[in-house]
């Protein structure tokens, strides 16, 4: 093996060792799912919200089909506002607490983390208040969301 190859291999190993000491950061979407479970007291699994109506899940267009779908539209709009502020809402980790009255943001000083946490807490509480209509899960968005 050439000396240059050994240097490259050594550099890779050292950088991997350094990366191993950095604790993994939770993705915001995982935290959001915990907030949803906290707000609805575990009455409905988080995956029920991933393909609901026109706005719950990835993307969104058209007129929301009901109150729950409006919660998702509002959450999408909140994330869009966060992005305008230079935040990365799907990657922002924050500190929250699950209390008797549902989730709330806790001791957050950074503006982006606070903004995103507020988006997620409000959406989770909205989900818990809104009725869930099984007929609006996994709908044909090409027909119903124009």
UniProtKB/Swiss-Prot annotation:
Disulfide bonds join 38-98, 54-145, 56-72, 71-126, 78-119, 87-112, 105-117. Pfam families: Phospholip_A2_1. It catalyses: a 1,2-diacyl-sn-glycero-3-phosphocholine + H2O = a 1-acyl-sn-glycero-3-phosphocholine + a fatty acid + H(+). Its main location: secreted. Residues 20-27 form a propeptide. Binds 1 Ca(2+) ion. Expressed by the venom gland. Its cofactor is Ca(2+). One of its GO terms (molecular function) is phospholipid binding. Ca(2+) binds at residues 55, 57, 59, 76. Keywords: Calcium, Disulfide bond, Hemostasis impairing toxin, Hydrolase, Lipid degradation, Lipid metabolism, Metal-binding, Platelet aggregation inhibiting toxin, Secreted, Signal, Toxin. It is found in: Secreted. It is an enzyme of class 3 (hydrolase). Snake venom phospholipase A2 (PLA2) that inhibits collagen-induced platelet aggregation. PLA2 catalyzes the calcium-dependent hydrolysis of the 2-acyl groups in 3-sn-phosphoglycerides. Belongs to the phospholipase A2 family. Group I subfamily. D49 sub-subfamily. This is Acidic phospholipase A2 S13-69J. It comes from Austrelaps superbus (Lowland copperhead snake).
